[in-house]
Amino acid sequence: MPLTDLIRYFNTADSAGDSMLYPEGERAAAWHRGLRLSSLFQPIVDLRQERIVGHRATLAARREDGTPVGSEAAYALCENAEAVVHFDRLCRTLHALNFLAQRRYAGGYLQLPIH
């Protein structure tokens, strides 16, 4: 399924309406309450086999003016537990879409942080 179709599906399923995934080149990005969200991937290396076995996703968040916001500070903006769950699902979806989009460059498994 093309990235744009997946994004449309997830945006339709977002009943809260305060978040939006969107295509950005060959990857996905998201807006959530004034923050622009994107994914960074760090390789996970098996030292015995001397090869990359996967990637760990990290959230990159910026305010509208471009000021970086740490991931913990981004989560701290959530007012309650339900908002944390929604934001966490948005971030994991964003990371999964971006990992799929780069699968021809990076294989292995995807490690996701969960809050």
Q: What does each model-identified segment do?
A:
Residues 82:
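Conserved nucleotide-sugar donor-binding catalytic segment
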Residues 32, 79, 103-105:
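Flexible, charged surface loops at secondary-structure boundaries
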Residues 85-115:
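Catalytic core of bacterial c-di-GMP phosphodiesterases, primarily the EAL and HD-GYP domains
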Residues 76-77, 85:
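N-terminal accessory/assembly segment that mediates macromolecular interactions
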Residues 13-76:
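Active-site core of bacterial EAL-family cyclic-dinucleotide phosphodiesterase domains
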Residues 1-7:
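Cyclic-dinucleotide signaling modules
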